[in-house]
Every structure is written in C-alpha cells, then in structure tokens.
Amino acid sequence: MPLNKDIKRVLVIGSGPIVIGQAAEFDYSGTQACEALKSEGVEVVLINSNPATIMTDKEVADKVYLEPLTLEFIEKVIAKEKPDSLLAGMGGQTGLNLAVELHDAGILDKYNVKVIGTSIESIKEGEDRELFRDMMNRIGEPVIKSEIVTDLQAGIDFANKIGYPVIVRPAYTLGGSGGGIADDEEELRTILESGLQLSTIGQVLLEKSVKGWKEIEYEVMRDSYGNCITVCNMENIDPVGIHTGDSIVVAPSQTLSDKEYQMLRTASINIINAVGIEGGCNVQFSLNPNTFEYAVIEINPRVSRSSALASKATGYPIAKLAAKIALGYGLDEIKNAVTQKTYACFEPTLDYVVVKIPKWPFDKFFGADRQLGTKMMATGEIMAIGANFEQAFLKGIRSLEIGKYSLDHKKFKEHSMSELKDLVMKPDDERIFALAEMLRRDYMIERINKITGIDKFFLEKIKWIVEEEQRLKLSNIEDLDKEWLKNLKKKGFSDKAIADMLKVSPEDIYRLRDIWSIKPSYKMVDTCGGEFEALSPYYYSTYEQYDEVEVSNRRKVIVIGSGPIRIGQGIEFDYASVHCVKALKKLDIETIIVNNNPETVSTDFDISDKLYFEPLTEEDVLNIIEKENPYGVILQFGGQTAIKLANFLKEKNIKTLGTTADQIDMAEDREKFDELLERLDISRPKGKGIWSVEEGLEEAERLGFPVLVRPSYVIGGQGMEITHDEEELTFYLTNAFAKDKKNPILIDKYLMGREIEVDAISDGENILIPGIMEHLERAGVHSGDSVTMYPSQNVCDKIKGKILEYTKKLALAIGIKGMINIQFIEFEGSLYVIEVNPRASRTVPYISKVSGVPIVDIATQVMLGAKLNDLGYGVDIYKEPELISVKVPVFSTQKLPNVEVCLGPEMRSTGEVLGVGRTLKEALYKGFVGANMYPSKEKGKILATINKHNKAEFLPIAKDLAKVGYKFIATTGTCKLLRDEGIDAEEIRKIDEEKPNILDIVKNREVDLVVNTPTKGNDSKRDGFLIRRAAVERNLGVITALDTLRAIADVELEEFDKNKDLEVFDITK
C-alpha cells in the first residue's frame, strides 16, 4: 500500500491522440505510471481518448474510459468513479492543461479530489511565463531579457525597444505551437497573432534572441522531502533557435567543461526546489559557448519527450518513479529496478554515448516549408547507443529509414558552396548532409562553427567520418585490411556504407568480417557504468572486446519493432509488437525485441526478456539473429519497417513466423495480385498502367470518369488523386509525367462507394474476423484518414457474407498464418477488393478494444501452430457488441507550414480518438468533440466554398445545418445556390477581390467552421489551398469531405441533451 494511506483511488489523465509535439512517449510514461500505482495497491481510473495506446488496455488500469479529454467528460468520469486523487503530470501538455482547468473551474474542489505529485500552484509557476520569470528573478537565476504580452501592439512595442530578432514563446502550448523567431515586424505580427490565439490563456513571452547559444537540458527528479537528483543531462547539437524536438540530441553532454556541467546542475536543482516539483522535471538552458553566461529557457513540470529519452538513455524509469513519489515515497526508499541493489537516489552513470535524431514527415508533404525553428515539426525520433559519438551518430543516420547509410548525399554534390552555406544557416531536416558536403570540400571548421553555432567538437567528429568516406571512395576492396575495417566498425560504419564507397556488395564486407572474426559485442545499459551488477536485459552493439550478453538454450523468438513514429506507421504498430511479446511470454518462449524508438512501450527494458536497442537494418538485425539463434523471427507487427526485411531473411534461410516473403510479394505485386483475384473470381476496380497523357485520356474514356490516378510505386497513398473530367486528368498527368517518365501512371475506375475494412486472423484452414469496419467517408479518402464505425452501420447480411467469403479465399490462397488486412468497396450492390496487406494494420488496437477480441494474442498463437477453433473466439465473423465505437482521425497540419489540409487518397493524420455511444450519433458526437472537429455554436457561422461536382450533394446538408441555427457565408456561386434554395447566406468577396475578402474573415476568425471541397491539384497558390491553410493555422475546423459534414449535421439534428444524456463507458466491463 502507498505511504500516504489517504490515497486509494487515483484518476490519471492521458495525453489523447498522437500529434506533432506529443507522441508515443506519453503512452510509455502513462503505462509506467499506471502500473506503478497498481503495484502499490492503489485503484487506477484512467481517461484517455486514444484507442491506439497500450495505456488504454483494460489490464493497465482498473477502470479505463476512452472518452473525449474535455472538462465535460472528465467531470462525468469523476462523478461516476469518485477518485480521491488526481495525478496530472503523465498526460503531457494536454493532461497538465486539463488539470489546471479542472482546478480553476472548481471541479476538483466540488468532488474533493486532491492533486498528488506536482501541485497546481507549481504547474502554474512552471507553465505561466510571467510567474516563472518572476520566480527566476527571485531566486537569482538568469533569464533572457523578455516581456509578457497579451496583445499585438505591446509585442511590437517591446521588439522595437530591444531590437530584432526576437523569440516568441506562447504559454500553455505544445511543441512550440504558435511560437517562432521573428527577424522583423512583419514576421512578428504573423507569429504573435498565431501565438496569442493558440495560448490557452492568451499570453506570450517575447524574449531577445540568443540564437546560436548552446541548448542544454537537465532531467531532474525531486521527492516531497526535498531530495533531488539529476538523472541525465543532454546537449543539443543544434544551438538555440531550433526546437529541442527537432534537434539532434546527445547524452551525456560532450562539450561542457566540468565547471559548466556543475553550474547548470546546481541551477537545475535550485529551480526544481523553488518551483516545488514532486516527480520529474525537464529544465532547458541556453549557454554562451564563449563565456560562462547562461540563461534559463523554460521548464516542463511533468514527464516529457525528453524524460522518455532520458529514461531510455539511462535505464532510469522516470515516470514510474514520479508515480511512486506522488504516493509519498522518497527517492531513498525506492529500489533501482535495473540493479535491485541501489536506490533511486543514486544518479545514473553512462559509459556510452546516446544520440537522438528526429524523424520528419516531409516525405509525405512535398510542398512543406522544411526550415526548422522554434516550432516542432518532427513526428517521431530514433535513438542510437554507441561506445563513441561517431558510432552512435552513424547508427542513428541509418535508423531514420531515409535510404542513407552514410553522410554522402548525392543531392548536395550539385550545390555551390554559397548554396550550402545558405542551407546550414537556415537549417532544414537535411542540414547535416549539407554540412558534411561543406566539410568534404574542406570548408574550415572554424567558419562552419561561426555560421551555424554547432560546436567544433561535433564538426571534427563529422569531419573524420567524411574523410574516411573519401578515403574509402579512393580505395578498392584489396586495400581494406583487418585493422582499418575493425576501426571503421568501431566508429559505426555499416557494411552497406563501406560497400557503397568501395563499389562492392555488403555481402563482400560481411565475408571479410567473417574471415577476420570482426563481430559485434553487446553491452548492457545498467544505470551505473558497470559499478554494480545489473539485471536489466537491455543491450546495444559495439565492436569492443567484451560481450555482456548471456545466450540461453530456451526456445526464443525475435520480434522486429516498427521504428520511429511517422504518418502511416504510428503507435498502433508498437501496440501490436508489445502484445505479441506478451503472448509469447505466456507460451513460455524467450522474447527478444529489436527496436530503436525511445518513445515507446516496446523499448521499456522490462517488457521483453531481452531488448536490443539497434537500427532495424538488414545487417544490424542479422547480427542479433546470429548471436541469439532464435526459433523464428516475427515481422508481422512492425509495419513496413519490419516487412521489408522479409526477402533478406528468406535469402539467409532464416525462419519467419507467420506470413513469408513470397506471400507478401503475392499481395504487393500488382500483376501477381491481379492474377490471384482473377483465379479466385474476386472483383477489383478496372484499370491499367499508362505511359502518356493521350493514352490516359483514352483509358479514362473507356473506364468513365471519375478515375483514380497514381504513380506506380507509392506507400500510404502518396501522389494519388481523383480526377473528374478531361481537364483535371490532363493537368495531373502532365505534371506527373514531367516528374517521372520512367514509370507508368496507374489509372483505375474510381468507384464512389462505401469503403469497408477488415482485420482477420488465418490459421491456414479457418479465419476469424473480429469485426467489419465501415468508413464514413466514401472511397477516395485514405483509410487512415477516414472516420471508422464499428459495428458497421450500413452493410447488409449479403455483403457481410461476401466479405467473409472473399477474406477466407484470399487468406487461404495467399497462405496467411497470422494477420491479414483487406479493404473493400461496396458499389451498387457489388463488392470489390482494393487492397490487401498481409500483416497487422493501424486498425488493430481499435478493433481489439471495441470487439473484445485479443487479435495480436490470437495471431501470435496461430503463427506458432495453434488452431483458431481451440482458442475460444470461434471462426468466421465474431459477434457484434451492443455499443457503437467510432474512430476519428486527428491531424497535425497546423504544425507544418505550407502543407495541404484536404482529405484524399494520401494519408495525412498523425493520430486518432474514439467515441463510444449507445447510438451512432452519440458515438459520432464524442468522436468529433475528442478530435476537436465539432463546431462551437457561439458564432454559428460556416464559411462554405463548394466545387461544381459537390453542389447538389451539399444543399440538403446546408438546409439541415440552417435548420439548427447555423449561418452561412459564401462566395458568389455558392451564395446564389444557397439563396435559391431559401437558405440565408451572406456573400463574401473572393481572394483576388478588394478587402475585406474571404481570406480576411478566416484570418480574423469571423467564422466557426470552414467547409471547402477542393478543385483540382494541390497547387499552393490556389484560393482553396490558401483558405484551408489560413483556417487550420488559426485553429478553425476545416472539413473537405461532405460525408463528414453530413455526419455533423445528423448529430446536430439529434435531440439528445449533450450534457445530460451522454454516458461514459468503462471498457474494462
């Protein structure tokens, strides 16, 4: 039981959907916290809207509510469950903001709920820019010259007084949202306007820019008795000016003198004591590289992205200990789980180097402004561990899955030196390659240091890597002797990088290593630099002498993880990997996980029997397989990252459990797949590959418009578009062939039907479909961006029978053992297959939770030989539940300048929320509220710009919205359409007409909701694009699919009292 006997039932608020700035790290920390509380005999009540998380599994907390994270719904949970305490710091910025709002609204007092861990007062002092600055002044900690402003003019006046550039930091926002660096008044106006709108209290800190100073972070722990330690200090390679979430970060710091290290450590402890933190806290400093001058940037009075990184870098479980501290324990009373001998008051010691590199989404968004600044844009990150900086850094580069194994990037070879200088002075996501190219051309390190602010230490290390690359390029394989190869491996060079430089194959380098016995050894992450014996089975590779892995004779399976979070491959795959590991453990199989993502539950050291924190490349994975000699390897749960290893493992005669490389090829090769469907007598939309605009127009005439067009080789719908007439098709094809003449464009008949999706399990004889999911938006919107309903609402028994028949035929014909995901279209009473994925999909966590079928557990048992009939869930289609569950996508496009908002065949969402209700409309209402898509009725104004193809469909929806009180603003054509039907509408001028025009009313937030159905293309100069961007940057709802608007109108027409009639549901029941 907890030290504080008054704590019996604790409410934990999760962080909600994955968005840029708040990703999987809060699933990791929230899961740790819930398990720590339960281990102390405390009952845990969890509210979180994100169904893709481990945290919302019914085993993690005693009561789990997948409900919107709003005061209205949290109060319902508090009223129903009557918790005595609230733990606020585990749900990121979302959880922290909600705790403050619950306090300020009097809800905590009303239900007698006390905040444990860091208090509301301490949260406010850490988050409110003015209170924090005043406190720093009181305790004598330096802050940068700054001013708190709540209006535009005050900000401009202050900037004029201190001079540009200035940094804008809004209060209570996430990942630097609404912030930035302004070099002049025009930039300041734009950033300030955004920052004031996005801050929950309308407050912004303006400070004199110290861009170019070092950015240093300390992760600190403190208990209620005042005991305080620093867990880890971290150094951003990128100086102040780039958000720490977009910076390459090294732990421990590499360039601080002992005096600087101790000075900032002392400051961190002074700050955490003054604020009164009880738990974990992240402190960020700027440090003048030429003097001992420093300033406090900010603190995060909660677990954070940096604390997840610090936990994985050190093996010190910050979130778990923060939860125990909240229960009243002191650091000197909590045992270190890694050593089982020392206590949590011992500061961790690192005898290795950790490098974190962000993963950006720009491969999905070609038009995005890639320049990095104080607003975070990365969706995820990788972490690499090495015996030295070079090794960790090169491991990190190849972990990013961008096709790069070295710092040699062809793109930058064509750039002039002045272009390269511009690139490193205005850094983007590829700046490290531009910097390497400058060093390759012998540009002086001192000058690069001066123009970038990157420390000479790191530049010298990168210079050494570049010089070795050049030396290899000028050599041949006969020049590569044993000592040189061994040194290259010690410094992190992969076989592929060495082979590419020598113009041989990686297999040639592997053979040399084999002959010379140059094999990796594996070291343990033990928190204590080897001072005490560690029990944690947490390893990284080096090429040092001693190996710390003990290989057992048990039957063992290696599970390949999914790597960094990105659009199209998110936290859902980590969920699947973790459940696979748990299922294997139940079967008494030794489980080994390989992954490189510091944010996730899968890389918690006590999830698997062994954790290898390594890149997910062919060489790094093969090294581990050769070390461990497993019974088999599971790829099905690691998304495309794991699946793309299938052919390589087949070539090496390594057994993959479940679906094989040949079966994957059958599903993914268009020609083979078409032949399979024909053989099975299964329909798919008609289409073919075309090589010219003329051929495309002929094929479209044969098929009939609309048609779906896309490049040949795409992932996640990249480059797909629906065209409605010859003009649109010609526009698309002309641009597509201008970019790529070597590959055909695929053109298919676009069926504007109902999209249906299933995740199924096959044992080779039977299949089990846990549930049939129906998409709200018609085909043409990527499945990951669609609102998804379960049970399906409009699928008749005849079609359900066809779905079962087709799924069984496909699974058995392909030879699936484990999971298969199939997407269908129902069109005019017929069923068509549009896609088959022979692996786990992103809907697995959702359908597992809402159907009650432990899909991954069953699939894992099937891979190892079990039969579905023996596993207790039957075969064919599982019975449907009474409650209706709706999955609603969540987008982060606000964080990505110049990125298209419009829904289409290419996936854009970063996360999702769940809405659960007794009726579809209740579930939709909760889902829309949770995703922040539901319009507020205070103004009740909808801006509507509808293209010619959608006007007839829009009218009845507009009538229903007008009926419940919404007012419309529209440009001439749409306005006339509405008035002709008797709907009151206000006319507004187009963008190219005099002010105030349509763009002005969006920028001034004079509307509640923007409904914009796009015309052709994604041209950033088009009016529709500019309107959508302006709306999303001002946090206004944007709807581009009329099916979504129809659903909102249906919910509005419903007569239930949204405050009184809506129940909250505990999914553990």
Curated annotation (Swiss-Prot):
SMART domains: CPSase_L_D3, MGS. Mg(2+) 2 binds at E298, N300. Binds 4 Mg(2+) or Mn(2+) ions per subunit. Residues 402-549 are annotated as: Oligomerization domain. Pathway: Amino-acid biosynthesis; L-arginine biosynthesis; carbamoyl phosphate from bicarbonate: step 1/1; Pyrimidine metabolism; UMP biosynthesis via de novo pathway; (S)-dihydroorotate from bicarbonate: step 1/3. Mn(2+) 4 binds at E835, N837. One of its GO terms (biological process) is 'de novo' UMP biosynthetic process. Its EC number is 6.3.4.16, 6.3.5.5. The keyword Cytoplasm does not apply. Its cofactor is Mg(2+); Mn(2+). It holds the Pfam family CPSase_L_D3. It comes from the Bacteria. Residues 932-1069 form the MGS-like domain. Mn(2+) 2 binds at E298, N300. GO terms for molecular function: ATP binding; carbamoyl-phosphate synthase (ammonia) activity; carbamoyl-phosphate synthase (glutamine-hydrolyzing) activity; metal ion binding. One of its GO terms (cellular component) is cytoplasm. Mg(2+) 1 binds at Q284, E298. It catalyses: hydrogencarbonate + L-glutamine + 2 ATP + H2O = carbamoyl phosphate + L-glutamate + 2 ADP + phosphate + 2 H(+). Residues 550-932 are annotated as: Carbamoyl phosphate synthetic domain. Residues 933-1069 are annotated as: Allosteric domain. Large subunit of the glutamine-dependent carbamoyl phosphate synthetase (CPSase). CPSase catalyzes the formation of carbamoyl phosphate from the ammonia moiety of glutamine, carbonate, and phosphate donated by ATP, constituting the first step of 2 biosynthetic pathways, one leading to arginine and/or urea and the other to pyrimidine nucleotides. Composed of two chains; the small (or glutamine) chain promotes the hydrolysis of glutamine to ammonia, which is used by the large (or ammonia) chain to synthesize carbamoyl phosphate. Tetramer of heterodimers (alpha,beta)4. This is Carbamoyl phosphate synthase large chain. The gene is carB.
